[in-house]
């Protein structure tokens, strides 16, 4: 197997893992919300209140997205917020495919 083929397989595997992490309606809603609030990100509380979900559910989904490298935690003053790791346009393009 040549280097380009190996690289391609790795890239496709990474893309599949990322899409797998996004493959839930609540996670897509979280990503859409984070797209609109990219500057300072959003707290877990803000996310669960806006989406009318339970806090443990949002925390679990954010953890899955964080482990996939899609979102990251940032500290804003005393609070921990979540924001997108990927470029806003990339996420918006992906989310638009589903909405």
What positions do the PLM features span?
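Beta-hairpin "wing" of winged helix-turn-helix
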Residues: 67-76, 83
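A short acidic, leucine-rich amphipathic alpha-helix
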Residues: 46-48
């Amino acid at each position: 197997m040549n280097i380009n083929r190996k690289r391609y397989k790795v890239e496709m595997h990474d893309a599949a893992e990322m899409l797998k992490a996004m493959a839930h309606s609540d996670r897509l809603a979280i990503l859409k919300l984070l797209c609109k609030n990219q500057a300072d990100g959003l707290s877990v509380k803000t996310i669960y209140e806006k989406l009318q979900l339970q806090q443990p559910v949002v925390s679990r989904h954010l953890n899955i997205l964080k482990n996939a490298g899609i979102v990251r935690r940032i500290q804003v003053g005393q609070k921990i917020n979540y924001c997108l790791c990927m470029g806003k346009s990339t996420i918006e393009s992906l989310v638009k495919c589903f909405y």
